[in-house]
Regions:
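Extended, charged low-complexity segments
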Residues: 203-236
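Short amphipathic alpha-helical interaction segments
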Residues: 44-59
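Short acidic, hydrophobic short linear motifs in intrinsically disordered regions
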Residues: 29-42
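Short, Lys/Arg-enriched C-terminal cap helix and immediately downstream tail that follows
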Residues: 62-63
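Short alpha-helical segments that sit at the start of domains
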Residues: 1-21
Length: 236
């Protein structure tokens, strides 16, 4: 379970990381992101200062804002608009940006979840649970069409195409029909562990944006294909 935090944070703490924690916990508890005034109240800051820190969080890719505004579009792993992935517990539910993010929600909230989606985002429905880091659907695959060093060139298209599949044949057919490359394919157990290592601290006050070096450590720990998962300074 999530640890407790004060109703407001000390006004001397103006870090983007603190704002990230407040945003994440608000989304977990309510299912939506706070507006600027509410976020300022939670942070114990003025709206002007909150806007400044929020922009800094955007600069380090800790949040995605609606263009030309301070409205929050997405806070990984949470999508704040409808998607093809719904993650639920007995007490709440959230949209996920992609298959990886759906597992990331489990890792961030540290509770068993049920994930409802479809194979390749198409008509074959999937409904499975993650309980204590395990799923009975051992046949599932998670596909990353594009390597991580390209993810922030366009955070919407790569993320939307990270999907679950129930077989190699289904994946190959999907890639052919939609003209997406066959990238890195992870068995579900590896995908769950990747989500745990990546998103496990996202609701923590100790969260920091991962550096290329830390990302590479995680990928190497899981034995991921270095030709696909190699990191560079372009991972922003």
């Amino acid at each position: 379970m999530l640890g407790t935090m004060p109703a407001t944070m000390p006004a001397t703490n103006h870090s983007p990381e603190t704002l990230h924690c407040l945003l994440t916990r608000h989304i977990i508890e309510t299912g939506h992101a706070p507006g600027l005034q509410k976020l300022a109240d939670l942070a114990g800051l003025t709206e002007e200062k909150t806007a400044e820190v929020l922009r800094k969080l955007e600069e380090i890719h800790g949040v995605i804002l609606v263009p030309n505004s301070l409205r929050i579009w997405s806070l990984h792993p949470f999508a704040l608009n409808p998607t093809s992935l719904w993650v639920s517990t007995a007490t709440g539910g959230w949209w996920a940006n992609c298959a990886w993010c759906s597992l990331g929600i489990w890792a961030a909230i540290k509770r068993d979840v049920n994930i409802f989606t479809s194979g390749g985002g198409e008509e074959s429905s999937m409904d499975f649970s993650i309980e204590s880091g395990q799923t009975r659907r051992k046949d599932l695959l998670m596909h990353f069409p594009y390597p991580p060093h390209t993810w922030w060139d366009n955070p919407f298209a790569p993320c939307a195409n990270i999907l679950f599949f129930s077989s190699e044949a289904q994946l190959d057919s999907w890639c052919l029909r939609h003209a997406h490359p066959r990238g890195s394919v992870l068995p579900i157990d590896v995908a769950v562990r990747l989500a745990e290592l990546w998103f496990g601290d996202y609701a923590s006050p100790d969260w920091v944006r991962k550096t290329p070096a830390r990302a590479a450590e995680i990928f190497n720990e899981l034995g991921l294909d270095k030709s696909f998962w190699k990191m560079s300074g372009s991972f922003r």
